[in-house]
Regions:
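A short, compositionally biased
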Residues: 51-60, 208-212, 312-314
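Non-catalytic, well-ordered alpha-helical scaffold segments
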Residues: 8, 112-115, 142, 237-240, ...
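Short coil/turn segments at secondary-structure boundaries
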Residues: 130-131, 206, 353-357
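Acidic, Mg2+-coordinating catalytic modules of nucleic-acid enzymes
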Residues: 109, 284, 325, 329-402
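P-loop NTPase switch/coupling surface
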Residues: 1-157, 194, 198, 385-402
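A short mid-domain helix/strand-loop element embedded in enzyme catalytic domains
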Residues: 38-48, 209-212, 261-268
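Extended helical coiled-coil dimerization/tether regions that scaffold
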Residues: 64, 143-264
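Switch/communication elements of ASCE P-loop NTPase nucleotide-binding domains
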Residues: 1-30, 212-349
Length: 402
């Protein structure tokens, strides 16, 4: 959808709906509907417009649980001063309450879904002041802390890396094995780095001395390099920190999976503008990479990039226009970017002044004014140089004159 079509609002609504289950968990917080979300309606009274927010604001959701049980729930904000209701979310809350009881009993068969929302401000963010180590209270629901804040909370993640790295060194001193959950998270990050850089020998570790994540790799000259992740470009940082945040949350939520935690944990991840900071070559593969690194996760993303849209099938695409969800009008997978721009995003791939000359050419052809058509086409050829569409227009003009 275009700017203002409602992509971010849709993702935030899904986040509010999903976070409802957190009301049943110790230490996790549900999101609420903001009064600013109310639709504004203007009434003409006298010489002025009287603008009034429209209530109630309601979010309705339907989900499939464990591939078989379908549930439905609603959250509502009835007035500007009211609170977001949970009374119509009984089905979801019963499931969450059952999860909480199983957590209290130490049930290792319980698989907690990873749930997170990443907004456009997700770049390697140190926005929260977390001076105390929340992992002192070692509970699996720590994996939900700040998961709906819209950013990868680097302070929380670094606390976890420090704790697990210390445990790794203690294991080594005592003759024990590695920490499989930590290695699984590093492996996910290494896969991500290798895929977007073309490297095949990257190694990611937590540096206790600098309290940074370091990445080691072999450069173009065969020299082994080691630099802090924080010194990489925005594109690398945003993508790798996203993968790291998802992976470490999985490890906290489901430590019983050990080294297979990223492969076995399911869940839903929301990403606003998944193409943010990414080179077009990365945009083409970002969804494929994410779904291969986390094969049991459902990703719901928004994008303006045709390179992202043509990397997925038509049935996986929703087009938003005027707050309405529409199916893609054509197959998207493998289509060229210009075709996606025209048919899906309703964007002209050429500047308006150039498009006007194209229109003038075809208008001249319709009027059989071939001299005018030739003049317009020659001007376009001078401006654009070698262009397949211009070559086709030249052939058409020659055929018309036979």
């Amino acid at each position: 959808g275009a700017k203002g079509a409602g992509k971010t609002s849709l993702l935030e609504s899904i986040a509010i709906a999903m976070s409802t289950m957190f009301t049943a968990f110790d230490g996790a917080k549900a999101m609420n509907i903001n009064k600013e979300s109310a639709h504004l309606k203007a009434y003409r009274i006298g010489s002025t417009d009287n603008v009034q927010p429209q209530y109630p604001v309601r979010i309705s959701a339907r989900a499939e649980i464990d591939g078989k049980q379908e549930i439905y729930w609603e959250r509502t904000l009835n007035t500007a001063k009211g609170k977001t209701t949970i009374k119509d979310a009984r089905q979801l809350l019963e499931i969450a309450e059952n999860y909480q009881k199983r957590l209290q009993k130490g049930d290792t068969t319980l698989v907690l879904p990873v749930i997170a929302y990443y907004g456009t401000g997700r770049l390697w963010d140190y926005h929260r002041e977390k001076q105390t180590d929340i992992f002192e209270k070692n509970t699996r629901t720590n994996g939900y802390i700040d998961c709906m804040s819209g950013t990868a909370n680097i302070k929380l993640m670094m606390n976890w890396f420090l704790k697990m790295t210390v445990q790794k060194y203690q294991n080594q001193e005592n003759g024990y094995g590695p920490v499989p959950e930590l290695e699984a998270v590093f492996s996910a990050m290494e896969q991500c780095y290798n895929r977007i850089t073309g490297s095949n020998d990257s190694k990611i570790q937590y540096n206790i001395g600098t309290k940074e994540i370091d990445v080691a790799y072999t450069d173009l000259y065969g020299v082994r390099m080691r630099i802090p992740l924080n010194q990489l470009s925005d594109g690398y940082k945003s993508t790798i920190s996203l993968v790291a945040d998802i992976a470490y949350r999985m490890a906290v939520l489901n430590p019983q999976f050990l080294g297979e935690v990223c492969l076995k944990t399911d869940g839903i991840i929301l990403i606003d503008e998944v193409d943010l900071h990414l080179h077009p070559a990365w945009q083409k593969r970002i969804l494929k990479d994410l779904t291969e690194i986390f094969p049991n996760v459902q990703f719901v993303v928004s994008t303006h990039a045709p390179e992202v849209i043509n990397s997925v099938l038509r049935e996986q695409v929703i087009v938003l226009e005027n707050y309405q969800a529409l199916p893609a009008p054509m197959e998207t997978y493998g289509k060229d970017a210009n075709g996606i721009l025209r048919a899906i995003m309703r964007v002209k791939e050429r500047p308006n002044d150039i498009m006007e000359q194209f229109d003038a050419f075809y208008h001249a052809i319709d009027l059989h004014d071939y001299m005018q058509a030739d003049e317009i086409l020659s001007n376009l050829e001078e401006l654009l140089g070698d262009d397949p569409e211009l070559a086709a227009m030249r052939v058409q003009l020659e055929l018309e004159q036979i």
